[in-house]
Amino acid sequence: MRLKRMHIRYYPPGIFLDYEKGGQLRTKCIDLLNLTPETDVEELVLEIRAAEPLITSSCVEQVKLLICKLQEKVGQKDERKFYLFRALQAHILPLTNVAFNKSGSCFITGSYDRTCKIWDTASGEELHTLEGHRNVVYAIAFNNPYGDKVATGSFDKTCKLWSAETGKCFYTFRGHTAEIVCLAFNPQSTLVATGSMDTTAKLWDVESGEEVSTLAGHFAEIISLCFNTTGDRLVTGSFDHTAILWDVPSGRKVHVLSGHRGEISCVQFNWDCSLIATASLDKSCKVWDAEGGQCLATLLGHNDEVLDVCFNYTGQLIATASADGTSRVFSTDTFQCLCQLEGHKGEISKVCFNAQGSRVLTASVDKTSRVWCVKTGACLQVLEGHSDEIFSCAFNYEGDTIITGSKDNTCRIWH
């Protein structure tokens, strides 16, 4: 094995090692999820050297430099305020979802008008309209980190795969017998998973357009699904009050996560694939051990349905969004509530962290989106201007752009 090159990933912090083995170029990553500005660099380098044979004495100084660069980024102060850059009359009927590509240079909007549109973030220009569905386009996703393909899931029971560059439709995936309401690409961008009101999830091959497997095991609609970062596991959340963990290569059930007393609204993996979070209409969120399937904690405190849940990039924090009009941030170490985000005047349907993990963004039926400080729980900014409820919001990877999607048929870009 011979080390060829090292490069870094900012969020979550990590160092990539490109190396040669048996004449082939390979890559491995050293995750530095606990890195802070206070981390002792010398000590960390010693730990890395002890654990990683590719790191020899000749490259220790470079490793130190890379860690210092990551520390600088992690410790960056984030004082920015967001301003409305563009309000886009995106669709003739209400939007269903919005999503960024990895770099944030483009984003997509799905709509009741049966189309998905691709937009240029910098100019607000429409790049492509993806037409062909015969009903509402409900679930949409880029194949991040690549960003060259888009998948759309529709109430017409099909999923379509498109070129993000040309807007051309590669494949239409047929097989579900009811509406498709959630979908995701695996991290390798070789598979698309779709979840449907027909109680099944399906895996589709991106290259051939063929169905790979049907994941049958739920007794009610599948409303949410998520791949882990290695792509070998998929979790599905259902109205049958359970989540199921699946082995992707075999299509077999690994664990049934049962314990909620109401429908599941959202399921998420953390970055290192060790935890799964489930949000439920039973007013709670549960955290599960992804390996053994045990429930590690029930996160309580909301007095109405929990509608969304997400991890920050390092997997150390969980944010919840509830119909009670509040959001909460919990520690994955202690499972204690660190702060309560209060200020919205109606249910919060969406919550997300910026990549740095310093901010939380929420979308609410009160027609506003809010930016919150994770450390203090203070509301830093109210993004106003939509004339109807906001159901979707997203940060780009750099954390300097926000998109909000509303039932007023518009999408807003905030810089």
From Swiss-Prot:
Domain of life: Eukaryota
PROSITE patterns, alphabetized: WD_REPEATS_1, WD_REPEATS_2, WD_REPEATS_REGION
Expressed in which tissues: Expressed in organs bearing motile cilia, including the pronephros, otic vesicles and Kupffer's vesicle.
Sorted UniProt keywords: Cell projection, Cilium, Cytoplasm, Cytoskeleton, Flagellum, Repeat, WD repeat
Keyword presence, Cytoplasm: yes
Main location: cytoplasm
Pfam family, one: WD40
WD repeats, residue ranges: 90-129, 132-172, 175-214, 217-256, 259-298, 301-340, 343-384, 385-415
Consequence of gene disruption: Defects are the cause of a phenotype related to primary ciliary dyskinesia (PCD). Embryos have curly tails, pronephric cysts and left-right asymmetry defects.
GO molecular function, one term: ubiquitin-like ligase-substrate adaptor activity
Compartments (UniProt record): Cytoplasm, Cytoskeleton, Flagellum basal body; Cytoplasm, Cytoskeleton, Flagellum axoneme
Annotated Gene3D superfamilies: YVTN repeat-like/Quinoprotein amine dehydrogenase (2.130.10.10)
Gene Ontology biological process terms, A to Z: axonemal dynein complex assembly; cilium assembly; cilium-dependent cell motility; determination of heart left/right asymmetry; determination of left/right symmetry; intraciliary transport; otolith morphogenesis; outer dynein arm assembly
CDD domains to which the protein is assigned, alphabetical: WD40
InterPro entries: G-protein_beta_WD-40_rep (IPR020472), WD40/YVTN_repeat-like_dom_sf (IPR015943), WD40_repeat_CS (IPR019775), WD40_repeat_dom_sf (IPR036322), WD40_rpt (IPR001680)
One Gene Ontology cellular component: cytoplasm
Protein family: Belongs to the WD repeat WDR69 family.
PANTHER family attached to this UniProt entry: TRANSCRIPTION INITIATION FACTOR TFIID, TRANSCRIPTION INITIATION FACTOR TFIID SUBUNIT 5
General function of this protein: Required for axonemal dynein assembly and ciliary motility in ciliated organs, including Kupffer's vesicle, during embryogenesis. Facilitates the onset of robust cilia motility during development.
Name this polypeptide is given: Dynein assembly factor with WD repeat domains 1
